[in-house]
Structures are given as structure tokens and as C-alpha cells.
Amino acid sequence: MAKQVILAVAGAGKTYHVCHMIDKDKKNLILAFTHENIHNILNELMDAHGSIPELTSVMTFDSFVYRYLILPYESTIGEFFGYPELISSGITTVDPPKQRIKGRNGEPIANPYYHSKNEFEHYINRKKQYYCATLSELVLYIKKGRDSLIKRAAAAINMFYDHVLIDEFQDFREYDYELIISMAKQINNMVLVGDYYQHSVSATNNSGKPFQNKEGEVGYDAFCHEIEKQGFSIDQCTLMGSRRCSKNICSYVSRKLGISIEGNNKNEGDIIWVDETSIAAIIQNSNIIKLVYNNANKYPFRALNWSYSKGDTFSQTCVILTEQLEKIDDPAFSIKKIKPTTVNKLYVAMTRSKGNVYLIKASVLKKYLEQ
């Protein structure tokens, strides 16, 4: 069985690679985390092949789990929980009741509406709709002796598809990640493509396995070791060059953030520090997108949060640094003192531009806004 993880860098063309590596005459299943990812994949497939290959299916991971791992085995699921006549009514994106809620004084208390994982109500609401948030957890939970939903479903998937490809794998956490690993042990050919350093960037789904454990953050080398333990080969070469960022930008990111990324020869761009004499021109230039750590809507100019810029490409960007990062250009500055999640968000922000990246210190911006 062929199982591979392709580790990429920002702007390397992950989706481009996925869509161009497939054999359109083979039966391919391409999965991604968000509908935006799916939209990008469909557009890339059109560019690569002129149309969506007839034998290629594209869907979100949640849709895949529901359609291939739950619906065909609903009678088995119903019997497992004592509901042999179960007929469900789709899925809901509303989250199930949490185990603990805040009391009158703000203290955590038990939620009377919470159901444990051995109860069917943990996975389905009163309208017989499956909770989207617990789909993978449900599939992992259903076992009878050595038999499991995963084994049965994987056998069917191997019949339907020659290759399974998962784009932006760094977006998957906890039960979704566990399900992917469990399926990989049964599915004949699976390829995962993603950027380790773009994990924990989104506002949601940013904790837990495989990037966090009881000891805290799982580093790059430890992550690679864990993936190899699961039977995957790792390709750290194919997508190590950014098609977006210049050599100068990538060199600075590598040197200051400790993230290995190679630039291209086509685009030209530099890191440019903005001081009190030049800040007005940069802030007032609407063609230069401003990227801020958070609360973009509170700034008196059009801005975008670092994390929300993930996946975007701009001609030029202006990254406004936090106080913690003001001295990043100093030789004595150590990125190791900064939280990994913050480093990842800064990495995303600094790799959005095809041209120049302007850097503004928080103190310089504060003075400008107080004028």
C-alpha cells in the first residue's frame, strides 16, 4: 500500500500539485477541510484538465464521512445503540451540548444536556440529525469485536477509488486526524498534502492531535517521526519552494522564524521596514493590504487578521507587528521565546506577497494613530 505525506511551504502550490499529479483516467477521490478549499480544487482541476475529470470526485471531509462511512452503515449504527429502525434526517452544523458550562457565578458546572460518547444522543439530536462535529468520533466508536465501520468502509472505498488525496491536511485535528490515520491503514493508496507551519492558524479547530499532546506543542521533527510511525513516507523536497514569494522574502522568513522555505527567481520583493517618515504613505496606500495580529475591524484603515489571510495572495503587503515581535530584526532576537501559534500566524502573514513586505512596529503605528 502506498501512503505518503508531502510537506509543503506557503505558496508552493499545494492544490496545484494535487490537481496536476492525478491521472485523470484513474478513479480519484480528493478531500479537503473547507468549502473554500473545494472551490479552489475544482478551479485548479479545470485549469489542469480542461474540465473536472469524469472519474474524479471532490468533496469536503465531513461530506465524505457522512456519505461513505455513516449513511451506508446506518442500520449497523442504529443496532449498535439499540435503535434498529433508525432513519436519520441529515446532519446539523449546530454543535452538540458541551460537557461543562458556566454557572451563575462563571464557575464551570456539569451540563445536564450533555450525553457521553456511549450514548447515541452524543452523535444525533432529537430531529435525528447527526452532529457534524462528532461524525468522525462516531465512526471511530462503532466496533464489534475485530470488525469496525472503518474496515468495512475502507474495503468499499478501495473498490470505488484508485487513489485518495487529502489537501491541506494540517487543518485536521483530533477525531478527524485519528480517522484519517485509521483509514490509511486500510486504504490502498493515500496521499496527504499540507504545510506543518500553517497548523493552529485558524480561529477554530486549532488544538489537539497531531500538533499538540500532553507535553504541549509537537515540533516539526517530532511530527515527522509520528507520521512515519503511522506508516507514511514523507516527501520534504517536492513542495519546499514558494511559487509566490521572492528569494529575499523567503530568506528573511527562514532566518528569523526558523522555517525552511525557498523563494523563486521570477518575483521580486524585499522586506522593507517602515518608520515615522514613511508610515503615512504606506497606511494610506489602499493597494497595500494591511495584515494585523487580530481585531482587524477595530483599525481606522482596511485590514485583515494574520490568520484570515491564509490562502491569499497579494501584490504587496504590510505586516503590523505586535510588541513582542518589534525587535525581530535585532541579531539577539530569539523566535524561540514566542508562542508557536503566534509564529505560525506571522509566517502566514509574511508569505502572502508576490512583491514587497512592509513591516511596521506596533510602537510606530501607535504614534502615527495618536497624531
Predicted regions located by residue number:
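The feature marks helicase ATPase cores and/or their adjacent C-terminal helical subdomains
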Residues: 1-371
